Amino acid sequence: MKKTVLSGVQTTGALHLGNYLGSIKNWVKMQEEYNCFFFLADLHAITIDIKTSELNNSIMEVLAIYLAAGLNPDKVTIFAQSMVKEHAELSWLLNCVTPLGWLKRMTQFKDKAGSDQCKACLGLFAYPILMAADILIYKADIVPVGEDQKQHLELTRDIAEVINRRFDKEILKVPDILISETGTRIMSLRNGLKKMSKSDIADFSRINLKDSNDLIYQKIKKAKTDHLSFISYDKKTRPEISNLLDIYKSLSKESMEKIINNYQNQGFAKFKEDLAEIIITNLQPIRDKCLELMNDKEYLLKILHKGAEKAKIRASETVNEVKKQFGFII
């Protein structure tokens, strides 16, 4: 029996190269080996202020990118989180067993809320509980995530164990965390110490999956390196050039040693020119297919509804099982 994998991307802002290399590219490989659930995290998206039209378009665009990148809806279950109401229902049940102190330790809330945490919405504070529900509702065996989500996954495991201990039986599967070695943490093109992010106000800090070829060239050409004239890999002392090398390695499948040797006597200009070409070669087919799919909203909606119906079968089973243990009438 195939193991179950679950992951998703929040439907806010434009998806970028970090999303592709850190998540979607790996999912495409996993769909052949696992029973996969890949969702659009639209409920998480409204923890920030987002316009109605922007959210609606973002849901469709993220779905189109999933498909354009190679996810096959006949092999995996693709759905919008909001279309499976059981996510919110299980989230409430988990809220009622999770100690407040656990949530107060979550570093991402502190980062996203900023200095005035009192103005942040409750949804942002409770974000990790909904994330736990997203995972536990499908009894996922494996959850592929970036390093920055590791704390949330550890919380998910703790919550599952609380439920299981409370009712003295394994109701919820305690998932394993999968952090791949390559591509999970692509950094900003302007600051090698910051993760590439949709929320960064500087557009030149990232390569968006829908960027034109010319814009990709410009962004890579202006990507920050350092004062040294040679190419080498050291994330601690040379974070910017190391980040560009990580991108090159992830897209070219060449070893780091070979890449560095190839450009040892050629300098940054030639390296950046070739890197831009590699990025374009990988992203242009995705961009073109995405634009084609966005012109067929009826097809995209059909995929969402089909995926939601399939997801609801397992989700409702889990929620009813948990509710029964609490004592609710099913």
UniProtKB/Swiss-Prot annotation:
<dbReference type="Pfam" id="PF00579">
    <property type="entry name" value="tRNA-synt_1b"/>
</dbReference>
<comment type="similarity">
    <text>Belongs to the class-I aminoacyl-tRNA synthetase family.</text>
</comment>
<keyword id="KW-0030">Aminoacyl-tRNA synthetase</keyword>
<dbReference type="GO" id="GO:0005737">
    <property type="term" value="C:cytoplasm"/>
</dbReference>
<dbReference type="GO" id="GO:0004830">
    <property type="term" value="F:tryptophan-tRNA ligase activity"/>
</dbReference>
<feature type="binding site">
    <location>
        <begin position="195"/>
        <end position="199"/>
    </location>
    <ligand>
        <name>ATP</name>
    </ligand>
</feature>
<feature type="binding site">
    <location>
        <position position="186"/>
    </location>
    <ligand>
        <name>ATP</name>
    </ligand>
</feature>
<feature type="binding site">
    <location>
        <position position="134"/>
    </location>
    <ligand>
        <name>L-tryptophan</name>
    </ligand>
</feature>
<keyword id="KW-0963">Cytoplasm</keyword>
<dbReference type="InterPro" id="IPR002305">
    <property type="entry name" value="aa-tRNA-synth_Ic"/>
</dbReference>
<keyword id="KW-0436">Ligase</keyword>
<feature type="short sequence motif" description="'HIGH' region">
    <location>
        <begin position="11"/>
        <end position="19"/>
    </location>
</feature>
<dbReference type="InterPro" id="IPR014729">
    <property type="entry name" value="Rossmann-like_a/b/a_fold"/>
</dbReference>
<dbReference type="InterPro" id="IPR024109">
    <property type="entry name" value="Trp-tRNA-ligase_bac-type"/>
</dbReference>
<keyword id="KW-0547">Nucleotide-binding</keyword>
<dbReference type="InterPro" id="IPR050203">
    <property type="entry name" value="Trp-tRNA_synthetase"/>
</dbReference>
<feature type="binding site">
    <location>
        <begin position="18"/>
        <end position="19"/>
    </location>
    <ligand>
        <name>ATP</name>
    </ligand>
</feature>
<dbReference type="GO" id="GO:0006436">
    <property type="term" value="P:tryptophanyl-tRNA aminoacylation"/>
</dbReference>
<keyword id="KW-0067">ATP-binding</keyword>
<dbReference type="GO" id="GO:0005524">
    <property type="term" value="F:ATP binding"/>
</dbReference>
<feature type="binding site">
    <location>
        <begin position="146"/>
        <end position="148"/>
    </location>
    <ligand>
        <name>ATP</name>
    </ligand>
</feature>
<keyword id="KW-0648">Protein biosynthesis</keyword>
<comment type="function">
    <text>Catalyzes the attachment of tryptophan to tRNA(Trp).</text>
</comment>
<feature type="short sequence motif" description="'KMSKS' region">
    <location>
        <begin position="195"/>
        <end position="199"/>
    </location>
</feature>
<comment type="subunit">
    <text>Homodimer.</text>
</comment>
<protein>
    <recommendedName>
        <fullName>Tryptophan--tRNA ligase</fullName>
        <ecNumber>6.1.1.2</ecNumber>
    </recommendedName>
</protein>
<dbReference type="InterPro" id="IPR002306">
    <property type="entry name" value="Trp-tRNA-ligase"/>
</dbReference>
<feature type="binding site">
    <location>
        <begin position="10"/>
        <end position="12"/>
    </location>
    <ligand>
        <name>ATP</name>
    </ligand>
</feature>
